[in-house]
Amino acid sequence: MEHRTRSWALGLSILGFFALLFSAGFVQQAHANDTEAMGTVIGIDLGTTYSCVGVMQKGKVEILVNDQGNRITPSYVAFTDEERLVGDAAKNQAAANPHRTIFDIKRLIGRKFSDKDVQNDIKHFPYKVVSKDDKPVVKVEVKGEEKTFTPEEISAMILGKMKETAEGYLGKKVTHAVVTVPAYFNDNQRQATKDAGMIAGLNVLRIVNEPTAAAIAYGLDKTGEERQIIVYDLGGGTFDVSLLSIEQGVFEVLSTAGDTHLGGEDFDQRIINHFAKLFNKKHGVDVTKDAKAMGKLKREAEKAKRTLSSQMSTRIEIEAFYDGKDFSETLTRAKFEELNNDLFKKTLKPVEQVLKDAKVSKSEIDDIVLVGGSTRIPKVQALIEEFFNGKKASKGINPDEAVAFGAAVQAGVLSGEEGTEDIVLMDVNPLTLGIETTGGVMTKLIPRNTPIPTRKSQIFSTAADNQPVVLIQVYEGERSMTKDNNLLGKFELTGIPPAPRGVPQIEVSFELDANGILKVSAHDKGTGKAESITITNDKGRLTQEEIDRMVAEAEKYAEEDKATRERIEARNGLENYAFSLKNQVNDEDGLGGKIDEEDKETILDAVKEAQDWLEENAATASAEDFDEQKEKLSNVAYPITSKLYSQGGAGDDEPAGHDEL
């Protein structure tokens, strides 16, 4: 009776339940359907602090080297007066250009501006983050005008860099990828990551949990008996622990836990805070207000942390750190451990959680896999080994590359690469999915840690007599009441014929695909009427129109980058040529001693003219202008220098014959 006072739309009650869980074979089938003509599929670890790209060819995974010769690329984007920089080049100039250098964008993607984590983060960012419809956007000055970029656009620039690295290695265009995300990313964050891929010109075939990818990398050479594995992934910005079972090439994630807000950067921050406090006390200043000085300290703190993984102490020296004062301090490994002791210990909580969730004891763990650069810290290794009663952690995989390695294997499976036929991957959903029933109760349809893809159905009914409509409200979260969980989406099923409460049979089905994207449908068994929704958190997502605009802008930036690069190369070409000519003409033992004074003067006049032109026009000239000036200079110099060779003036002691170049 009391239920009638509630809105009809909220009334759903449980009648019965059945569920269908697809087996690993279904996953293989899903993979087989995807192996169309998509070219080489790449695997990308889109990290908070660093990103990495791999590719599988002929059964072998290759982690690719970027244009700086590095296997990992900083997840940094910067804007200077002349150009846009991505990766190493962006990070290297961060201290000198803090307000226009964007990093840690993964902390903002798919989140709301009002989210308390976002609010905490933006306090630490030297760049400006503002709200646009409660979505965080980065505000930065580009070529003299204020521009805003969504987290998807910035992430797309990083993904674009990884795509470029892969294309450079493969010598052909790349259009498809597998991208990894932390296990704790919700649907909105996963969708936003896929959108970023689209903006970068990549069709993201799969979003894979990072620990799962690391397990694939680790599990490739494992066969035979079932093994239980803890994957402890402590990266730059996120922390994930997963418990996996691996048996004869089949991976199953039994449970996952973690902290989306714990990693190497937090350890860096402790060093930064410690030394800033020390410096302020010594000099009676507040260095934290100077973004440039803090940028320098950030760079040195990260360096010191890395050094302390192999040495007992290190010295941090920064010339003209603040207000003309130098910075010089020593950091010992013991002090570093003391500064971060509570954070290191905090990493053990999720380890306890995954064991509890999967009902597995410490002694049943066969392997501990360490992933992420922060697992190089000796204290972190010692703590985890101590937790597992002295069991040694596996260190066979480069912790920075394991996730990209696994993503590349999964990419190989999807593109049908040889050597991947026997690999089956079962992933899990990170949070419980359900709907609201009478009284605001969270009724669970897919519990957290269910292997995906999966489909589950349940029969519900009306909560009031003659109720013509039901409202299906879909939530994710672990709390028993929906008000404490996250609303993903809602829709109405209308036109239910008049009937006493509890009589209509409404089947609600949840279908979760391999990327963790959810489709919910409701079907009135009496009338055959059905409605459905694909949960994509539209409120937080980009519209197709926005994505198209961003794709066009990304292409425009790529063209601008190319034009800038060509301009710089052409300018360097002219500068180097003029400089080299001047040096040669002034070298009495070389060219200068072999040409007469008049020719020498002709060349030097032409060089001066080119250098004067450079001084006046370098800032605005195009690549063609520089090439034209170089040709003009060459037209003066070439007839004079070629005269030498025709006269045999290149030197009497040269051998008569040469190999052709």
From Swiss-Prot:
Keyword Hydrolase appears in the UniProt entry: yes
Broad class of where this protein is predominantly found: endoplasmic reticulum
Stretches the record annotates as Nucleotide-binding (NBD): 135-289
Organism: Neurospora crassa (strain ATCC 24698 / 74-OR23-1A / CBS 708.71 / DSM 1257 / FGSC 987)
GO CC terms of this entry: cortical endoplasmic reticulum lumen; cytoplasm; endoplasmic reticulum chaperone complex; endoplasmic reticulum lumen; luminal surveillance complex; membrane; nuclear membrane; nucleus
Signal peptide: 1-32
Regulation: The chaperone activity is regulated by ATP-induced allosteric coupling of the nucleotide-binding (NBD) and substrate-binding (SBD) domains. In the ADP-bound and nucleotide-free (apo) states, the two domains have little interaction. In contrast, in the ATP-bound state the two domains are tightly coupled, which results in drastically accelerated kinetics in both binding and release of polypeptide substrates. J domain-containing co-chaperones stimulate the ATPase activity and are required for efficient substrate recognition.
Motif (Prevents secretion from ER): 658-661
Catalysed conversion reaction: ATP + H2O = ADP + phosphate + H(+)
PANTHER family in the record: HEAT SHOCK PROTEIN 70KDA (PTHR19375)
NCBIfam families named in the record: PRK00290.1 (NF001413)
E.C. code: 3.6.4.10
Biological role stated in the UniProt entry: Probably plays a role in facilitating the assembly of multimeric protein complexes inside the ER. Is required for secretory polypeptide translocation. May physically associate with SEC63 protein in the endoplasmic reticulum and this interaction may be regulated by ATP hydrolysis.
GO molecular function list: ATP binding; ATP hydrolysis activity; ATP-dependent protein folding chaperone; heat shock protein binding; protein folding chaperone; protein-transporting ATPase activity; unfolded protein binding
Region called Substrate-binding (SBD), residue ranges: 409-509
Record's subcellular location: Endoplasmic reticulum lumen
Keywords: ATP-binding, Chaperone, Endoplasmic reticulum, Hydrolase, Nucleotide-binding, Signal, Stress response
Protein name, per record: Endoplasmic reticulum chaperone BiP
InterPro entries according to UniProt: ATPase_NBD, BIP_NBD, Heat_shock_70_CS, HSP70_C_sf, HSP70_peptide-bd_sf, Hsp_70_fam
Entry similarity comment: Belongs to the heat shock protein 70 family.
GO BP, sorted A to Z: chaperone cofactor-dependent protein refolding; endoplasmic reticulum unfolded protein response; ERAD pathway; fungal-type cell wall beta-glucan biosynthetic process; IRE1-mediated unfolded protein response; karyogamy involved in conjugation with cellular fusion; post-translational protein targeting to membrane, translocation; protein refolding
Residues that coordinate or bind ATP: 47-50, 106, 236-238, 302-309, 373-376
